[in-house]
């Protein structure tokens, strides 16, 4: 057992070094990933609200739509359910689908993109963590950072604050 301050420091250090705090716990403390994720993902999803605008905007995009998260696929499904986005996505991939290797590591993308049959030059990656866009960019995907903190990194094609607004812009043909 560790105190909260020590736990927070460990979490931040593991996230920085290993991509997720889970990966650091697995590496340094032999934590079972399924046990850990079952505990941290046991949350109240009812605080989330449906987002009809986002659903409509996503549905206007051509092609397959996938979710790839450093959380688990079941966790992502719950989030999507409470956000009213269940029927928008064709496939959902979680960290378990990458053998618990997290984004931003190249192996994680290689595993998931291979399973999903991603055609790199015809795909885009939307991500809220800038460091998770470098590998997809190098693979030839268009990269979109969705965050209040904007980025001018060379591997970020677009940096936007609001995903719904961005999608509305590109699907209305007013996109430059």
Predicted feature residues:
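Short, contiguous strand/loop micro-motifs
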Residues: 8-10, 41-45, 63, 96, ...
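Asp-based, Mg2+/Mn2+-dependent phosphohydrolase catalytic module
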Residues: 34, 59, 66, 72-73, ...
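Catalytic-core regions built around general acid/base machinery
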Residues: 53-62
């Amino acid at each position: 057992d560790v105190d909260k301050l020590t736990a927070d420091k460990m979490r931040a250090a593991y996230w920085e070094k290993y991509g997720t705090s889970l990966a650091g716990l697995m590496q340094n403390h032999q934590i079972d990933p399924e046990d850990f994720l079952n505990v941290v993902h046991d949350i109240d999803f009812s605080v989330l609200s449906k987002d009809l605008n986002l659903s409509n905007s996503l549905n206007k995009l051509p092609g397959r739509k996938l979710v790839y998260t450093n959380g688990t696929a079941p966790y992502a499904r719950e989030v999507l359910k409470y956000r009213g986005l269940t029927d928008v996505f064709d496939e959902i991939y979680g960290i378990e689908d990458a053998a618990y290797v997290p984004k931003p590591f190249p192996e994680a993308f290689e595993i998931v993109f291979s399973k999903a049959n991603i055609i790199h030059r015809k795909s885009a990656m939307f991500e809220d963590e800038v460091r998770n866009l470098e590998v997809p960019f190098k693979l030839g995907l268009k990269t979109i950072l969705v965050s209040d903190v904007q980025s001018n990194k060379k591997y970020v094609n677009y940096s936007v604050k609001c995903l719904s607004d961005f999608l509305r812009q590109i699907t209305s043909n007013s996109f430059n």
